[in-house]
Swiss-Prot record:
Signal peptide: none
Stored Pfam families: Ribosomal_S2
UniProt keyword terms in alphabetical order: Cytoplasm, Ribonucleoprotein, Ribosomal protein
Assembly and binders: Component of the small ribosomal subunit. Mature ribosomes consist of a small (40S) and a large (60S) subunit. The 40S subunit contains about 33 different proteins and 1 molecule of RNA (18S). The 60S subunit contains about 49 different proteins and 3 molecules of RNA (25S, 5.8S and 5S). Interacts with RPS21.
Subcellular location: Cytoplasm
Family to which this protein belongs: Belongs to the universal ribosomal protein uS2 family.
Taxonomic classification: Eukaryota, Fungi, Fungi incertae sedis, Microsporidia, Unikaryonidae
Identification of the protein by name: Small ribosomal subunit protein uS2
One record GO biological process: ribosomal small subunit assembly
């Protein structure tokens, strides 16, 4: 039987906008260490600091597989998306809003999948996690329940208990935001035919910002607004002086 050498990523070409987003967000920059199971996802190693470079084509291929798995579930609300990291909470919440999944953020209470006595117990069909190390309790319980697990994994993360590993830098707020943003776009593209690269500025909604950074952004915005008002006022005064009617000026 002849082998089909067609790559999964060839079915949906990665848009240039997504390539730029992955690079700008440093999604392709892994750690300095790696394991054997992750070696197939590596593009190379940066000589000056020994940073492992993740192959963007491998990331795209796994994002497509993850999106197909998601679309195979009839009720999206039965898919649990977990992130215990602070900067992973906003991307998870925005992702779930976009695709209809159930977010579980903050501390993952042991027994949330396995103990019916827990105050809020979940019975998901699929699990998605942002980090196999930080979310290891959720992955452990998913193994007890035989839940298919999708995970964003870095170069030194364990792949034990993971069915679909999406190779990506999961220790950067911008990278994890880009990952969930692109995955949500792929899911909606497969389900409804929505454009992949419509309004790329929406990725900002997935990005976590701490209070200090938000204050700086507000101050910068206020300065820009003030400068623009002053410039407009100055131009208006100058234009009025240059084109004013003599009778109007004399009336004062």
């Amino acid at each position: 039987m002849p082998q089909d050498n067609t790559r999964i990523s060839d079915s949906i070409k990665i848009p240039d906008e997504f390539v730029k987003l992955l690079i700008v967000s440093q999604s392709h920059l892994g750690g300095t260490s790696t394991n054997k199971s992750f070696a197939r996802y590596l593009y190379g190693t940066r000589p000056r600091d020994r940073i492992n470079i993740i192959d963007i084509n491998a990331t795209w291929e796994k994002l497509i597989i993850a999106a197909r798995a998601f679309c195979g579930i009839k009720h999206p609300s039965s898919i649990a998306v977990v992130s215990t990291k602070t900067f992973g909470r906003k991307p998870v919440v925005k992702f779930c809003e976009a695709v209809g999944a159930t977010p579980i953020t903050g501390r993952f209470i042991p027994g949330s999948f396995t103990n019916s006595e827990v105050k809020r117990v979940y019975d998901p069909r699929v699990l998605i996690v942002s980090d196999t190390y930080a979310d290891k309790q959720a992955i452990l319980e998913s193994q007890y329940c035989n839940l298919p697990t999708i995970a964003f994994v870095n170069t030194d993360n364990s792949l034990v208990g993971v069915d679909i590993a999406i190779p990506m830098n999961n220790r950067s707020p911008s990278a994890i935001a880009a990952g969930f943003f692109i995955l949500s776009r792929l899911i909606n593209y497969m389900k409804t035919g929505a454009e992949l690269v419509r309004d790329m500025k929406e990725v900002e909604l997935f990005l976590f910002r701490d209070s200090v950074e938000l204050e700086q952004l507000v101050e910068e915005q206020l300065l820009e607004t003030t400068d623009s008002i002053l410039n407009v006022g100055k131009e208006g005064i100058l234009s009025g002086i240059g084109t004013g009617n003599a009778d109007e000026w004399n009336s004062f």
